């Protein structure tokens, strides 16, 4: 019995020490364990692979609809506003790659660099998150709001980001070379400021870790909706239902607005629970619409469970 306990203790100690090893990024299995709600396809690094089709449809969803849906699901800390935006009239959606930056601490920075060297990572550590980006990814970094001497990228790294992801960045921090970044066709960024300085006294603490972006908690593989008013980070398992729900609400609103303009119904009739006659009218109106955002099959499946 005593021998068995010793063996068990040694196993526990070994497991603990293994878990405490410095990692630049979690393993795919660790990312899967971090995002258990996602049941679909995953990328090679373990992140949820939200579909490109839903990412495209998400572009047409309002921040308010996305925010409201998530709050109703109990996710009340997924929005951050007050950004400086490179192209404020453009929308960006994508799958999140996270990076955590911290104030420089030489001993830990040395451990991260040694680990990265062993993994054949090259260049400065602020380029490492860029190397893992794939098409459709958005680079999201917490650099603790540092503006002066906190510029995570300039136009060189901006070009590399766009070449990898065809998207842009969301930084709780700053960038430099703003004119050069503006010249990258298709690139966009939501940042907290610009500064001509270069990055100093900062270190990369990890890639694809849970991070904080202002008021929001963000996990690798979340889906981001970034617009003029701010950014919403969506757990991937809710994306499809959020998009369908929001598209349906927009159709319902469009129908209501049209019927109010026509004088067919009063505001009181539209704003309260609909009667069977209004529901029937709405379904007929739906069937007359061209270019619906969802397929007929998706709409039929959604409406089976719809509580009017």
Can you say where each PLM-predicted feature lies in the sequence?
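Positively charged n-region of N-terminal signal peptides that target proteins for export
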Residues: 1-5
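Channel- or pocket-lining gating/hinge segments that regulate access to a cavity or pore
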Residues: 229-232
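Boundary at the C-terminal end of the N-terminal hydrophobic targeting segment
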Residues: 17-21
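Buried hydrophobic positions in well-ordered alpha/beta secondary-structure cores of metabolic enzymes
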Residues: 46, 161, 222-224
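Bacterial N-terminal signal peptides
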Residues: 7-15
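Feature captures the catalytic cores and cofactor-binding loops of soluble hydro-lyases/lyases
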Residues: 57-65, 69-220, 234-283, 287-308
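Short acidic, Pro/Gly- and aromatic-enriched capping/linker segments at domain boundaries
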Residues: 22-42, 53-57
């Amino acid at each position: 019995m005593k021998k068995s306990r010793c063996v068990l203790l040694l196993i526990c100690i070994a497991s603990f020490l293994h878990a405490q090893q410095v990692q630049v990024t979690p393993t795919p299995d660790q990312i899967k364990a971090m995002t258990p709600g996602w049941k679909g396809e995953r990328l090679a690094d373990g992140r949820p692979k939200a579909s490109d089709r839903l990412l495209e449809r998400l572009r047409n969803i309002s921040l308010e609809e996305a925010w409201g849906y998530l709050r109703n699901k109990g996710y009340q800390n997924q929005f951050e506003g007050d950004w400086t935006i490179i192209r404020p009239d453009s929308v960006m959606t994508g799958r999140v790659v996270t990076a955590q930056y911290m104030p420089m601490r030489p001993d830990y920075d040395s451990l991260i660099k040694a680990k990265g060297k062993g993994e054949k990572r090259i260049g400065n550590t602020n380029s490492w998150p860029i190397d893992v980006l794939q098409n459709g990814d958005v680079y999201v970094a917490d650099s603790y709001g540092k503006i002066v001497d906190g510029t995570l990228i300039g136009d060189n790294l901006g070009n590399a980001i766009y070449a990898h992801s065809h998207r842009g960045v969301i930084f709780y921090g700053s960038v430099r070379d703003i004119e050069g970044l503006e010249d990258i066709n298709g690139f966009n960024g939501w940042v907290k400021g610009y500064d001509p300085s270069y990055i100093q006294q900062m270190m990369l603490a990890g890639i694809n870790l849970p991070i904080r972006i202002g008021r929001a908690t963000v996990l690798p593989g979340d889906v981001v909706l970034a617009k003029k008013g701010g950014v919403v980070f969506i757990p991937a398992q809710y994306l499809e239902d959020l998009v369908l729900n929001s598209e349906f609400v927009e159709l319902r609103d469009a129908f209501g607005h049209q019927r109010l303009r026509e004088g067919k119904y009063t505001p009181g009739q539209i704003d309260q629970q609909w009667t069977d006659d209004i529901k029937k009218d709405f379904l007929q109106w739906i069937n007359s619409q061209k270019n619906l955002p969802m397929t007929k099959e998706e709409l039929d499946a959604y409406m089976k469970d719809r509580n009017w």
